[in-house]
Amino acid sequence: MAETTTAAAEEERNFVAHFKDQQILPPDEIQQNPRNEGLGASSRNLSVRDFELVRTLGTGTFARVWLVRLANPAEEDRDKVFALKVLRKVEVIKLKQVDHVNHERSVLSDVAGHPFITTLITSFSDHDSLYMLLDYCPGGEVFSYLRKAKRFDENTARFYAAEIVLILEFLHEREGVAYRDMKPENLLLDAEGHIKLVDFGFAKRLGNRETYTLCGTPEYLAPEVIQSKGHTTAVDWWALGILIYEFLTGYPPFWHSNPIEIYKQIVSKPVSFPAEPAISPAAKDIIRQFCTLDRSHRLGNISGGAARVKDHPFFQGVIWEDVYYRKYRGPIIPPLRYPGDAQNFDLYPDEKEGREPYTEELAAKYDDRFKGF
């Protein structure tokens, strides 16, 4: 027992140490740097009992994200807080999300250390649940700020779009990963107002292959996804076009209360712009080039890839190295009162009692498929 406790304490020290003098590494050094080597690896000796659950940050169909701190921290680590994503095995199985959950953990493990992607520090499991320990982004969702502001000015939209471009460049060109769920709800702000992309449940390694799964959020789906033609990383550039439109107007270009009607609009209607608010010609052009029905002509997916995106007039004057190294000041600085402040997140009801148990029969059938945790 003492040996297990010592091992758990060592794992705690390792992942806490990562944040003490975190530095931004060039993209080609992220995976090679010894400092990032252990990030995302499974921790066999960690338990949910090693953490104090402070409050819920978000919920999903089969997951709940908690704000947590170490249960027995060293004095210098008392202010350290994290986000703990808890996935109930029985719900993951019922909703046929086993592959998606494994993809999420695997992809996050490989991209840990990127300045604009949530950091998977470690993962672990117990009989009933899977756990992913992530860095805490205290600013909350970009979605919330957009709703309060009604819309963003062009400089704000450009700031967030530029950071997303660097995310997609890294995922697509270095990792061969399609993210497939770009939307304001999946963009969090850190304490300095920079983006962190979260929720990689639909992310998938494609390389140069196509995939045919219908997944994502209706308003942001590319036409080839809806038409089951097979899709690639090009779907993320389409979604970025939709996102920039929403940043500038306050709403997506395709909308209806019935998702089927949204799909019909996406595959048949070009993006149109309102008379008000005024949108610059450069912004309109980049949106149109991202939201091109034929992906072979879609900006980001054509020859030159992300480099062509960076050269677009919408990003004129942007120094991309300064974007990557976070030298630009965030346009929205989240209000924070103390370390671990969660005022920028909604309140959520407690978990319901009487959840369906993860039986020994289910464990015998499925536990091998969760061995990555």
Give each language-model segment a name.
Residues Y160-A161:
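Activation segment signature within eukaryotic-like protein kinase domains
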Residues H127-E141, Y145:
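Conserved short submotifs of the Hanks-type protein kinase catalytic core
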Residues A283, Y324-F373:
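Eukaryotic Ser/Thr kinase distal regulatory-tail detector
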Residues S123:
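Activation-segment/catalytic-loop signature of the eukaryotic protein kinase fold
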Residues R64-K89:
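Glycine-rich ATP phosphate-binding loop
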Residues V54-T61, V65:
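Protein kinase glycine-rich loop
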Residues M1-V48:
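Intrinsically disordered, low-complexity regulatory segments that flank or precede the catalytic domain
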